[in-house]
Curated annotation (Swiss-Prot):
The glycine cleavage system is composed of four proteins: P, T, L and H. It catalyses: N(6)-[(R)-S(8)-aminomethyldihydrolipoyl]-L-lysyl-[protein] + (6S)-5,6,7,8-tetrahydrofolate = N(6)-[(R)-dihydrolipoyl]-L-lysyl-[protein] + (6R)-5,10-methylene-5,6,7,8-tetrahydrofolate + NH4(+). Keywords: Aminotransferase, Transferase. GO terms for biological process: glycine decarboxylation via glycine cleavage system. It comes from the Bacteria. Its EC number is 2.1.2.10. The glycine cleavage system catalyzes the degradation of glycine. GO terms for molecular function: aminomethyltransferase activity; transaminase activity. This is Aminomethyltransferase. It comes from Francisella philomiragia subsp. philomiragia (strain ATCC 25017 / CCUG 19701 / FSC 153 / O#319-036). PANTHER family: AMINOMETHYLTRANSFERASE, AMINOMETHYLTRANSFERASE, MITOCHONDRIAL. The lineage of its organism: Bacteria, Pseudomonadati, Pseudomonadota, Gammaproteobacteria, Thiotrichales.
Length: 358
């Protein structure tokens, strides 16, 4: 199994390790709910070094990314980041990722752990005739520091000059300091940073964060935090057979430039013109029980919806889920252990900055 540069740090913190996409990763350090609540109330630090930063450089870098991404990097200013999907020719989602624009000839993309090899292969396959260099940054570690106290804690671990600069960063902006990159991005619905730095420096940085008040958080808390924030998990909420339209991600597909042709555009437009029969939604269980991926939601007109991610919400203290359901139909229910239980359909975003949105 693959190990991140922080593997020994996790063992020292008594982490429970699990296999995630072939990586040995911490699921928790004792209490997933405590780690979740700490991110909502204070500051948690996650090892996300199983994800991969890929640098895209060259004269045709922007042209290349405008072709393989459904969002349009031409809209990005230097120093800003953008969420988007990479589609196949049938408009299915190959991956969802964040693109960071350094300048018009230099970009960085962070791809999901389970798609590291396939994404890099896709990049190479679709850049053969272009002046583009694709460099997977195998020697970078990635740490996410998240929560209302994240900025203050990170500031205490860096020089005064760096602290002043990173405090000015707005959401979805980033800045380099030598070979460290600080991005005001995250996967929790809280403020904070995702920091990319040399793998051989990350253990000391991790220790420094903990000494200054951050507490480690595992993949379990990361999953419930992102679910509360209404953020998608690749492989659970979408895959190569689903389009952005069907998963509430149509906003991330930029169709404003009619002359731009991106992979999957034709199929996407066809699907858009025909319309889709489902809608993406949040789900709240009105009684005790747990919602899980794969559960059916039954409607009074005989139609069914399906849960793609579900869990108990530590913040809201109810079971919540993300699901796709028919556009028509009322009185949704789920069947849990032989009992028919009512659920409520809500906007697919439950918590923001620690506050309930439902």
């Amino acid at each position: 199994m693959l190990k991140t540069p922080l593997y020994e740090s996790h063992l020292a913190a008594n982490a429970k390790m699990v296999d995630f996409s072939g990586w040995s990763m911490p699921i928790n350090y004792g209490s997933q709910i405590q780690e979740h609540n700490n991110v909502r109330e204070n500051c948690g630090v996650f090892d996300v070094s199983h994800m991969l930063a890929v640098d895209i450089q060259g004269k045709d870098a922007e042209k290349f990314l405008r072709h393989i991404l459904a969002n349009d990097v031409a809209k990005l200013e230097a120093g800003k980041a953008q969420y988007g999907c990479m589609l196949n020719h049938e408009a299915g989602i190959v991956d969802d990722l964040i693109t960071y624009k350094i300048d018009s000839e230099n970009f960085r993309i962070v791809v999901n752990a389970g798609n590291r090899e396939s994404d890099v292969a896709w990049f190479r396959e679709n850049s053969q005739d272009l002046d583009v260099k694709i460099t997977p940054q195998q020697n970078l570690a990635i740490v996410a520091v998240q929560g209302p106290k994240a900025v203050e804690i990170v500031k205490h671990t860096v020089t005064t000059e760096v602290a002043e600069e990173i405090a000015k960063l707005k959401p979805f902006t980033f800045k380099f300091f030598s070979n460290w990159m600080f991005a005001r991005t995250g996967y929790t619905g809280e403020d904070g940073f995702e920091i990319m730095l040399p793998a051989d420096q990350v253990a000391d940085f991790w220790d420094n964060l903990l000494e200054n008040g951050a507490e480690p958080a595992g993949l379990g808390a990361r999953d419930t935090l992102r679910l509360e924030a209404g953020m998608h998990l690749y492989g659970s909420d979408m895959n190569t057979t689903t389009t952005p339209l069907e998963r509430g991600l149509g906003w991330s597909v930029d169709l404003s430039d009619e002359n731009r042709d991106f992979i999957g555009k034709k199929a996407y437009l066809t699907k858009k013109s025909h319309g889709i029969t489902t809608k993406w939604t949040g789900v709240v269980l009105k009684s005790k029980g747990v919602l899980r991926a794969g559960q059916e939601i039954d409607f009074d007109n005989g139609e069914k919806g399906y849960i793609t991610s579900g869990s108990f919400s530590p913040t809201l203290k109810v079971a919540i889920a993300l699901a796709y359901v028919p556009k028509e139909g009322a009185n949704p229910i789920v069947n849990i252990r032989g009992k028919e239980l009512e659920v409520e359909l809500v906007k697919a975003k439950f918590v923001k900055n620690g506050q309930s949105l439902i």
